[in-house]
Amino acid sequence: MATVKVYDQNKQESGEVTLASDVFEIEVRPEILNLVARAQMAAKRAGTHNVKTRAFVSGGGAKPWKQKGTGRARAGSNRSPIWRGGAITFGPSPRDYTFKVNSKVRSLALKMALSSRLAAESLMVVKGIVLPEAKTKHFAKVADTLGLTKALIVAPEENADLTRSARNIPGLTLTTVDRLSVLEILKHKQLVLLEGAVESVQARFEKKGA
């Protein structure tokens, strides 16, 4: 089991916490991280793109000119894909981009993402963040003190004041343990766990038996 230092919001050491080796110290397999990250990105796609093919574009029923005798190239419809204002060939149509990934693989990928941040020494445990006011400037000051530039901050549960204070700071994302995802971890260079989140993350896997 790994032991990491716990810091307060002023970046002063305030203790240590032990991280479960079966959650934070497993072998990282890039192909599994890639699979789950792609699945999560695909799930975000609306898939509402659409174009009009020959079947849907209006007009074009009449032959523009007779087949022979005009000197022009033959044409059967003014809605042909090669005409201006015509239909689209092989364009996109609405579709569902999601694909299934087994729950055990998703769970394994999340452990790998957490392990990758610990191995890269870019995981920090912070005792807690208490702001005098729910203002962006106060959160920005704490982030600057902790040296956070592109960081995912994980709270054990929803905190409206922290959410409101952090949402406009570029590069910082505040989330909760139940919304923690592989994609979000990989998108950020730093991972910050508020102290209560460590136990919640480990309990999340215990409940699943993963």
Curated annotation (Swiss-Prot):
Record GO terms (molecular function): rRNA binding; structural constituent of ribosome
Statement: the UniProt record of this protein carries the keyword Translocase: no
Record flagged with keyword Ubl conjugation: no
GO cellular component term of the entry, any: ribonucleoprotein complex
Superkingdom field: Bacteria
Function (record text): One of the primary rRNA binding proteins, this protein initially binds near the 5'-end of the 23S rRNA. It is important during the early stages of 50S assembly. It makes multiple contacts with different domains of the 23S rRNA in the assembled 50S subunit and ribosome.
PANTHER family xref list: 50S RIBOSOMAL PROTEIN L4, LARGE RIBOSOMAL SUBUNIT PROTEIN UL4M
HAMAP family: Ribosomal_uL4_B (MF_01328_B)
Similarity comment: family membership: Belongs to the universal ribosomal protein uL4 family.
Subunit note: Part of the 50S ribosomal subunit.
Name of the protein described by the UniProt record: Large ribosomal subunit protein uL4
